């Protein structure tokens, strides 16, 4: 029991590592909270610190979720689902003890959790994400739509044995929780989308006609 408790705490602390914030401060002498959206996640890192830093933060944030999900396997822990460890990593990412309980928007770390538990389900979500990104040129909208399609996937796929071969109650609960976290963390982005002033990536069709302010 003690090892389980310690690993659960470790999962939160792993997720809480603010790679974007630390990379910005150490290598660029910039505090991401003072630039752009003020967020320390992948998207703001790309915009403020550049492509290399953005890729690094994305990979690190993704691996936080994956590693946390794999901890029970690494330490031969039975009786507790790997998804619980992954969820704690996402909570750590969004409410980091190392960053005054601030954090990112949970997309990359949530993707890491899904990668560690169901890679094909993540592939399905990645296709949705890329398609929406190309059509509308907004990472925020792509993230929210992918979260919604994750909810649809856990409801529909088990009925057809497609990607998810059986209905997994805990997986469904965790996916629901991750989707709600992602959507909630993007509430300001959704307001900007409504006002047609959301930030855009420099490619895609921008079908909604957003104009950055």
From Swiss-Prot:
The keyword Cell membrane applies. It catalyses: an acyl phosphate + sn-glycerol 3-phosphate = a 1-acyl-sn-glycero-3-phosphate + phosphate. Catalyzes the transfer of an acyl group from acyl-phosphate (acyl-PO(4)) to glycerol-3-phosphate (G3P) to form lysophosphatidic acid (LPA). This enzyme utilizes acyl-phosphate as fatty acyl donor, but not acyl-CoA or acyl-ACP. Belongs to the PlsY family. The gene is plsY. It comes from the Bacteria. One of its GO terms (molecular function) is acyl-phosphate glycerol-3-phosphate acyltransferase activity. Probably interacts with PlsX. The chain crosses the membrane at residues 3-23, 48-68, 71-91, 119-139, 144-164, 165-185. Pfam families: G3P_acyltransf. This is Glycerol-3-phosphate acyltransferase. Its EC number is 2.3.1.275. One of its GO terms (biological process) is phospholipid biosynthetic process. GO terms for cellular component: plasma membrane. It is found in: Cell membrane. It is a multi-pass membrane protein. Pathway: Lipid metabolism; phospholipid metabolism. Keywords: Cell membrane, Lipid biosynthesis, Lipid metabolism, Membrane, Phospholipid biosynthesis, Phospholipid metabolism, Transferase, Transmembrane, Transmembrane helix.
